[in-house]
Swiss-Prot record:
InterPro entries: 4pyrrol_Mease, 4pyrrol_Methylase_sf, 4pyrrole_Mease_sub1. Fusion protein of the methyltransferase dbiM and the dendrothelin core peptide; part of the gene cluster that mediates the biosynthesis of dendrothelin A, a highly methylated cyclic dodecapeptide showing slight nematodicidal activity. Dendrothelin A derives from the C-terminus of the dbiMA protein, and it is the dbiMA protein that methylates its own C-terminus using S-adenosyl methionine (SAM). The C-terminus is subsequently cleaved off and macrocyclized by the prolyloligopeptidase dbiP to give the final product. The modification N-methylvaline is found at residues 401, 403, 407, 413. This is Methyltransferase/ribosomally synthesized cyclic peptide dendrothelin A precursor dbihMA. It comes from the Eukaryota. The active site is at residues 72, 76, 98. Keywords: Methylation, Methyltransferase, S-adenosyl-L-methionine, Transferase, Virulence. It comes from Dendrothele bispora (strain CBS 962.96). Residues 379-399 are annotated as: Precursor leader. Disulfide bonds: none annotated. The modification N-methylthreonine is found at residue 404.
Length: 417
């Protein structure tokens, strides 16, 4: 469906629908669902299922392969094989899974690996995962101060390490030690083993957030705050189900290494770094975080400078034609058009009417920087840098590209393989 180098008929594209019904499905995922020869889906809400069925009439619901007491791994093997069978029959297959199709999803990875090993085109497209929803709903940044993510049973079985100075996210906390499936939910009888481990690492008084992402647009997420010790209470423990996730905030901030700060030259000469990294805004779930004020001296000065702001010389405002906007949109959302373009950049670019000469040259080349130059009002200083970068790339074995002249946005671009 996408590559001109494919020699065997049949392909597999795996996409995600996000967690919240319909609205978190990407435009890219939707375009592949619409273009597929056959769609296999496993989603958790009927509105998303109904929406998928309006976009492609040749669909199979994979959820029917779950059963009470049946091994989930057996189900996953069957799901993968159902998709692979149609790929081997020469169809362009799309597998649709809720959330991100590669995050806590086994059959997608299995099917892709086997398809690739057999010589078929296979690709996974990103989607909105439950973890993405958690970051948004709890307003935490995984980069500050770092984040560990584990599956709860694996966390216990393999004694995965904990860094009490970073975020910890545990998935599938409502089915600890359970390998089969039950339509009525899981008997989470081994849950206290997980609580024991968390108490060992953090103590009974540390915060844990019981999180469930909203699955319908009219719902709010569950963000219940408890102590780890409270998880032993039956009334609280029974709230934890198959779609529950735990977020455990850092226990304390780690001291910075002042020697490394100096080596990296992060601070002006003579300035002494604080013992702790101060932040704003603070993490509402984290205790005792050294926090900066929202409007300190530096912030107030930066806001004052807005009054005299003028775009810098190297700022790049958009300056593109409707034809270029339309064709780039088509390449993003039409898998068949994308396949045609990848097969022959030059022929495809020549078939598009109303492009400027610069836009057509950039489209023929297919280089992201050249396309950016054509669509933006690119300053000459950046164009010269682009020219130098292209020249260096050609020396390293990339296709030979010569920027022969700079006229307007970009000059004529000559490319030969």
């Amino acid at each position: 469906m996408e590559s001109s180098t494919q020699t065997k008929p049949g392909s597999l594209i795996v996409v995600g629908t996000g967690i919240e019904s319909i609205g978190q499905m990407t435009l890219q995922a939707l375009s592949y669902i619409e273009a597929a020869s056959k769609v296999f889906y496993c989603v958790i809400d009927p509105a998303t299922e109904a929406f998928i069925l309006t976009k492609n009439k040749n669909c199979v619901d994979l959820y029917q392969y779950y059963d009470n007491g049946k091994s989930r791994m057996d189900t996953y093997t069957q799901m993968a094989e159902l998709m692979l069978k149609e790929v081997r029959n020469g169809l362009d297959v799309v597998g649709v899974f809720y959330g991100h199709p590669g995050v806590f999803v086994n059959p997608s990875h299995r099917a892709l690996a086997i398809a690739r090993s057999e010589g078929y085109q296979a690709r996974m497209l990103p989607g909105v995962s439950a973890e993405d929803c958690l970051f948004a709903d709890l307003c935490i940044d995984p980069s500050n101060p770092g984040c560990l993510t584990y599956e709860a049973s694996d966390f216990l079985i393999r004694e995965r390490p904990v860094n009490v100075h970073s975020h910890l996210i545990l998935f599938q906390v409502g089915c600890v030690g359970i390998a089969d499936f039950n339509f009525s939910g899981f008997d989470n009888s081994k849950f206290t083993i997980l609580v024991d481990r968390l108490e060992q690492e953090y103590g009974p008084d540390h915060t844990v957030v019981h999180y469930i992402a909203a699955m319908m647009p009219h719902q709010d997420p569950v963000t219940d705050k408890f102590t780890i010790g409270q998880l032993r209470e039956p009334e609280i423990a029974k709230r934890v189900g198959g779609v529950s996730t735990f977020y455990i905030p850092p226990k304390a901030r780690k001291d910075i290494n002042t020697d490394i700060i100096r080596l990296l030259e992060f601070l002006p000469a003579g300035k002494v770094p604080d013992k702790h990294t101060q932040i704003y805004p603070p993490n509402q779930w984290e205790p005792d975080v050294p926090t900066l004020p929202p409007y300190g001296q530096n912030e107030q000065a930066a806001i004052t400078r807005l009054e005299a702001h003028a775009p810098p010389e190297e700022y790049q405002p958009l300056a593109t034609s409707k034809a270029m906007t339309d064709v780039m949109t088509k390449l993003a959302l039409d898998p068949k058009a994308l396949a045609e373009y990848k097969a022959d950049h030059r022929a495809f670019a020549q078939s598009v009417p109303d492009l400027t000469p610069q836009e057509r040259a950039a489209l023929e080349l297919g280089d992201s920087w050249a396309i950016r130059c054509a669509m933006k009002n690119m300053p000459s200083s950046l164009l010269e840098a682009a020219s130098q970068s292209v020249e260096e790339a050609s020396m390293n074995g990339f296709p030979w590209v010569i920027v022969t002249g700079i006229v307007g946005v970009i000059g004529s671009v000559v490319s030969s393989a």
